[in-house]
Regions:
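Long, charge-dense
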Residues: 55-95, 99
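Short, well-ordered secondary-structure micro-motifs within conserved domains or adaptor modules
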Residues: 154-171
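Structural motif
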Residues: 45-46, 120-126, 167-171
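Metallocofactor- and cofactor-centric catalytic cores in central/energy metabolism, strongly enriched
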Residues: 3-36, 43-53, 58, 73-82
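Short, charged N-terminal beta->alpha structural module
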Residues: 5, 119-142
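Conserved small/polar residues in nucleotide/adenosyl-binding loops
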Residues: 176-180
Length: 180
């Protein structure tokens, strides 16, 4: 679901002329980085970084304990909303993986499932995980987190899954059967 807070950095021609767009973005990120409200702040650049002059890699990785994730999603290179969400999921998983590699992290709220789990990546309707879970159950599998995740700890659970199911109208599957 799209129940996430969305902020933006207002800018005008003065910002562009003075070349302060990156500074304005950096200041806005510092303002937003309140650990009482956010686990992470994702900054999305919808332009090519070299053209926009917004080098998101120069933002800090963390401010006040809030993760800062910069992603470049150029509009002409990423044609659909779903694919942009895949880029977001990849950036979030990469950040979470680095945290896991650095040391202990919080356990997912529901704990670890006793069955192998399948992370689900892509466009999902609210009932989809339950229906998919019911289909996986006879195989001894369980539905894992949906990515992009609503809660940061779900990313750690996704990294612990046995496999990923790419659920997306643009993903296709080729089934291979060996000749008998």
């Amino acid at each position: 679901g799209a129940r996430r807070s969305v902020g933006y950095v207002p800018f005008n021609s003065e910002t562009l002329v003075t070349g302060k767009l990156f500074e304005d973005i950096r200041d806005a990120v510092h303002e937003l980085a309140d650990p009482d409200h956010y686990d992470a702040v994702v900054v999305t650049n919808l332009c090519v970084p070299t053209a926009s002059g917004v080098p998101l890699r120069l933002l800090p990785n963390e401010i006040n304990g809030v993760r800062i994730i910069g992603i470049d999603v150029p509009g002409f290179g990423v044609p659909t909303h779903a694919e942009a969400k895949d880029i977001l999921a990849g950036a979030m998983l990469n950040f979470a993986r680095q945290e896991v590699e650095a040391g202990p992290v919080q356990s997912p709220k529901g704990g670890k499932n006793d069955r192998p789990t399948i992370a689900m990546l892509g466009e999902m309707f609210p009932a989809d995980p339950m229906v998919i879970g019911a289909m996986l159950d006879p195989m001894g599998l369980a539905a894992g987190p949906v990515l992009p995740a609503r809660e940061w700890r779900e990313l750690y659970a996704a990294l612990d899954c046995e496999a990923v199911a790419a659920i997306h109208p643009f993903y296709t599957c080729l089934l291979y059967t060996s000749p008998s």
